[in-house]
């Protein structure tokens, strides 16, 4: 049997603090379990990551303000601008990685809710192999996965590459 756990079938943004099945979403693209009883949902057109508490069915905003900008690094993820949240993954330490397609970047939200740029930035490019991830550039990343060894793998789509 199939049933809806989040979203009411209409386009928009609403419902924080209420039942997830009554919430609106614009374009959910990916989801990941957070290891704390939640399902994180990347909504690329809403510029947010939402969190569904699986036990209570309540939805809240985990990251993003709805503004289509790349802002807020070093601050709370809930107060940061997210630029095209295409995909997410959660590592074994509880850190959440956000793949920002339009922002050409990977950002991390640590267990205390602080967001940090990990790789890329607003400018498109293909550089940085062999160096620190923070100095690398990306071009339209579309997917991200965290492996059991703590690596973050990125589908760097427009560069026709998988990067780690």
Where are these regions (language model features)?
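Gly/Pro-rich loop segments of beta-rich domains
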Residues: 1-27, 56-84, 113-140
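Phosphodiester-processing cores and adjacent nucleic acid-binding clamps
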Residues: 31, 51, 152
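A short loop-to-beta-strand structural motif that recurs across blades of beta-propeller domains
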Residues: 1, 47-51, 58, 104-108, ...
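Conserved beta-propeller blade signature
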Residues: 38-41, 95-98, 151-154
